[in-house]
Amino acid sequence: MKILVDENMPYARELFSRLGEVKAVPGRPIPVEELNHADALMVRSVTKVNESLLSGTPINFVGTATAGTDHVDEAWLKQAGIGFSAAPGCNAIAVVEYVFSALLMLAERDGFSLRDRTIGIVGVGNVGSRLQTRLEALGIRTLLCDPPRAARGDEGDFRTLDELVQEADVLTFHTPLYKDGPYKTLHLADETLIRRLKPGAILINACRGPVVDNAALLARLNAGQPLSVVLDVWEGEPDLNVALLEAVDIGTSHIAGYTLEGKARGTTQVFEAYSAFIGREQHVALETLLPAPEFGRITLHGPLDQPTLKRLAHLVYDVRRDDAPLRKVAGIPGEFDKLRKNYLERREWSSLYVMCDDETAAALLCKLGFNAVHHPAH
């Protein structure tokens, strides 16, 4: 049995080699000739999986080590009798921590307290719900918008997008990309919405580029109305609008979900799905794969305030480290994908062991996802 895996999928070789022969290949463009000699294909979001890619090949299973699946024609796979699995929620924590890193940076730069801001979360799935939990642990007011969940009668105080635009100081998007249908999200943030954002508002998109109308966003920024923008995703990736990148506060190369833990979770989820598909079910403990974190442990004295949280968060991951490299190479063909391929190792907050002499600080850090313990000072 031969399994093709995206070369950017960590731990894929060591896991899938338990099931058969493994070959690592680039995800964009994928070497089509390899598909004629393989049984399974494991991809990330850069590979478009559809009839034109797989028709006439012996591939009988596709796994994507990503939460999003808009790069996969699931209907065709089903019709062709090809097994499929994604990795929902695998990088949700990573995206939440990206949003926090950006917000804490902007709050320090512009001198505001996050507790004085209302944060509107558009799309309350794996990412949005975790973001809500962490923000509320800090006493930050959130407003939720998720029409499909509201229609299903899910528990939660769901508002309309209009209400969020009127009331929220921060609008952060965490939806799938639906190009049509009743819950279409293509240009969900369209010209009208972008024009109506409060002066001084913050707009964050770390889901899919086309959820925000990039041309309309650039027009608003060029008009000189105060608006802070954080974009990890772009229309037309990998060919982003360079003028827009120059105008935003933080711009990164679709890496919000790129923690070592998130990528490893994605790989293990599709590995477990494929092993079950071929009748050789196996389970993997994530911690057995991950290396020891860079920082052993740190000690925190006293309560947890916003500057301290920012220092801890940025010790693990400062979003600015990914903004500068993109600006340097913007507009040069192939460089966007190169940044993703050669991405520096990044960990999640759970990799930081914090000893606190303040019990409340330790409890709050645990709620936020840090590995914190209360250690009274003697």
UniProtKB/Swiss-Prot annotation:
Homodimer. It comes from the Bacteria. One of its GO terms (molecular function) is protein dimerization activity. Catalyzes the oxidation of erythronate-4-phosphate to 3-hydroxy-2-oxo-4-phosphonooxybutanoate. The keyword Cytoplasm applies. This is Erythronate-4-phosphate dehydrogenase. Its EC number is 1.1.1.290. PANTHER family: FORMATE DEHYDROGENASE 1 (PTHR42938:SF9). GO terms for biological process: 'de novo' pyridoxal 5'-phosphate biosynthetic process; pyridoxine biosynthetic process. CDD domains: ErythrP_dh (cd12158). The active site is at R208, E237, H254. Pathway: Cofactor biosynthesis; pyridoxine 5'-phosphate biosynthesis; pyridoxine 5'-phosphate from D-erythrose 4-phosphate: step 2/5. SUPFAM superfamilies: Formate/glycerate dehydrogenase catalytic domain-like, NAD(P)-binding Rossmann-fold domains.
